């Protein structure tokens, strides 16, 4: 079971809700994926008018755990304010904290992230910290009270998959008891499987499903890939070797 701030979930797939062709496809993709947690941007929800209200009603009808996020924030003040608004609107202390440092790469501003995390942790928030694959940053986030760290796999929406596996592997090795969720940059089900094979606890993705030719089928594919990756990790994956090793025993081999 996946344990997040004292709550247990059977699915290790978390799904974003943006960019889907229609609400109906989003709903069906969520159902097919088996996810129990979806992320929602407060900026989308509070975009105003009738559309925002309809989306909020749609979310309530899903009867699923909502993880609001601070997507689109560039400063500590923006992120903290957004977190407070999200807590009031969604009635949850959970917040996926993300602060962008560069408009082109969408790379997290880890310095502002740590500062905002310290503030929000002191105010009783349960933070899911979206960060880079830097071990030291992850440790600093733990120091200020975060219990769930979300290293990126690659830049948001890039679909490149794990581009720095050694970084992800290092975080997992040095933080064996911390809940780690790979977030951003996932493009294929195989990417998600790799993350799970590294020992990560879950995967959060959005674009790879939302922009797929068949989002519903892709949601199912990711669900199965994550399950397979987790099973492989638990079973004990064979380490790669630089030399060949025969798999067929030579005892009893005929000699001519």
UniProtKB/Swiss-Prot annotation:
It is an enzyme of class 2 (transferase). Its main location: cytoplasm. 1-deoxy-D-xylulose 5-phosphate binds at residues 157, 184-185, 206-207. Its EC number is 2.8.1.10. It holds the Pfam family ThiG. Pathway: Cofactor biosynthesis; thiamine diphosphate biosynthesis. The active site is at 96 (schiff-base intermediate with dxp). It catalyses: [ThiS sulfur-carrier protein]-C-terminal-Gly-aminoethanethioate + 2-iminoacetate + 1-deoxy-D-xylulose 5-phosphate = [ThiS sulfur-carrier protein]-C-terminal Gly-Gly + 2-[(2R,5Z)-2-carboxy-4-methylthiazol-5(2H)-ylidene]ethyl phosphate + 2 H2O + H(+). Keywords: Cytoplasm, Schiff base, Thiamine biosynthesis, Transferase. GO terms for biological process: thiamine diphosphate biosynthetic process. It is found in: Cytoplasm. InterPro entries: Aldolase_TIM, Thiazole_synthase_ThiG, ThiG. It comes from the Bacteria. Catalyzes the rearrangement of 1-deoxy-D-xylulose 5-phosphate (DXP) to produce the thiazole phosphate moiety of thiamine. Sulfur is provided by the thiocarboxylate moiety of the carrier protein ThiS. In vitro, sulfur can be provided by H(2)S. Homotetramer. Forms heterodimers with either ThiH or ThiS. Belongs to the ThiG family. This is Thiazole synthase. It comes from Bartonella tribocorum (strain CIP 105476 / IBS 506). The gene is thiG.
């Amino acid at each position: 079971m996946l344990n997040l701030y004292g709550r247990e979930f059977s699915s290790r797939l978390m799904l974003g809700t943006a960019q889907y062709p229609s609400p109906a496809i989003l709903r069906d993709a969520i159902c097919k994926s088996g996810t129990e947690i979806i992320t929602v941007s407060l900026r989308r929800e509070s975009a105003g008018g009738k559309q925002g209200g309809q989306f909020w009603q749609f979310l309530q009808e899903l009867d699923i755990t909502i993880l609001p996020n601070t997507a689109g924030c560039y400063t500590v003040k923006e992120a903290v304010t957004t977190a407070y608004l999200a807590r009031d609107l969604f009635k949850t202390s959970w917040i996926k904290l993300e602060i962008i440092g560069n408009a082109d790469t969408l790379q997290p501003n880890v310095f502002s992230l740590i500062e905002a995390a310290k503030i929000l942790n002191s105010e009783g928030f349960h933070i899911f910290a979206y960060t880079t694959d830097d071990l030291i940053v992850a440790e600093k986030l733990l120091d200020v009270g975060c219990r769930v760290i979300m290293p990126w796999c690659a830049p948001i929406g890039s679909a490149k998959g794990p581009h720095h596996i050694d970084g992800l592997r290092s975080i997992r090795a040095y933080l064996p008891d911390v809940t780690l969720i790979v977030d951003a940059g996932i493009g294929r089900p195989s990417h998600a499987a790799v993350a799970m094979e590294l020992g990560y606890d879950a995967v959060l993705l959005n674009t790879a499903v939302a922009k797929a030719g068949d989002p519903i089928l892709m949601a199912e594919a990711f669900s199965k890939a994550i399950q397979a990756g987790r099973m492989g990790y638990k079973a004990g994956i064979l380490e790669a070797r630089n030399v060949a090793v025969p798999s067929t025993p030579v005892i009893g081999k005929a000699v001519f």
